[in-house]
């Protein structure tokens, strides 16, 4: 397992466990439009990735992070990978708070994971690889987000766009 991928999985999983052991901790981490825009709790744009709605939510996100993280981190390096992950999470959070109601609470790292899919598209195109499977996986995940209530598809879309843009900029030939 690549070092930054391992670190992210360890920290996110550790916070999930901490939230189980310390009731009320999650309330200081999750994303909510009112808390960010009206109370200035901007840390939530990133800390939302440390929270999850259950063990299966955590498992699926960490599995996706493991698969995408190892591949991308190997291809683009630790610093750029971490930058894309964090930028994607911020983009996901901004999309969520600007396009959701004030009372909506959002949890999870899936916005950042979708950002990694956006980065994977950029990397795949750069190396002339087929992107059809990536588009299919993204489409299936968006469909799930529309079918099942409580999934923040706005964050997924924001993360995907932010990851694509971040990778396009960070991996441009003049920056590489």
Predicted features, each with a name:
Residues 24, 97-98, 128, 164, ...:
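Membrane-embedded alpha-helical segments of multi-pass transporters/permeases
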Residues 1-4, 10-13, 132, 142-176:
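C-terminal transmembrane module of polytopic alpha-helical membrane proteins
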Residues 74-79, 83, 120-135, 171-176:
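Alpha-helical transmembrane bundle and helix-membrane interface signal
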Residues 58-65, 107-119, 152-171:
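Alpha-helical transmembrane segments that form the membrane-embedded catalytic/substrate-binding core
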Residues 97-115, 119-123, 127-128, 145, ...:
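Transmembrane helix-loop-helix hairpins at the membrane interface
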Residues 1-107, 148-151:
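N-terminal TM1-TM2 helical hairpin plus the immediately adjacent luminal interfacial "cap"
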Residues 87-88, 133-142:
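Central hydrophobic cores of alpha-helical transmembrane segments
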């Amino acid at each position: 397992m690549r070092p930054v991928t391992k670190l992210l999985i360890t920290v996110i999983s550790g916070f999930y466990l901490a939230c189980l052991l310390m009731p009320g901790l999650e309330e200081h981490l999750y994303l909510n439009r009112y808390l960010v825009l009206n109370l200035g709790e901007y840390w939530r744009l990133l800390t939302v990735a440390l929270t999850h709605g259950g063990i299966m939510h955590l498992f699926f996100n960490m599995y996706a992070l493991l698969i995408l993280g190892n591949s991308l981190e190997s291809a683009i390096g630790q610093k750029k990978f971490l930058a894309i992950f964090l930028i994607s999470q911020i983009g996901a959070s901004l999309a969520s708070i600007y396009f959701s109601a004030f009372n909506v609470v959002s949890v999870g790292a899936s916005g950042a994971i979708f950002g990694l899919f956006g980065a994977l598209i950029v990397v795949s195109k750069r190396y002339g690889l087929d992107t059809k499977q990536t588009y299919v996986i993204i489409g299936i995940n968006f469909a799930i987000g529309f079918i099942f209530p409580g999934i923040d598809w706005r964050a997924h879309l924001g993360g995907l766009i932010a990851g694509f843009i971040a990778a396009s900029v960070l991996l441009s030939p003049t920056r590489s």
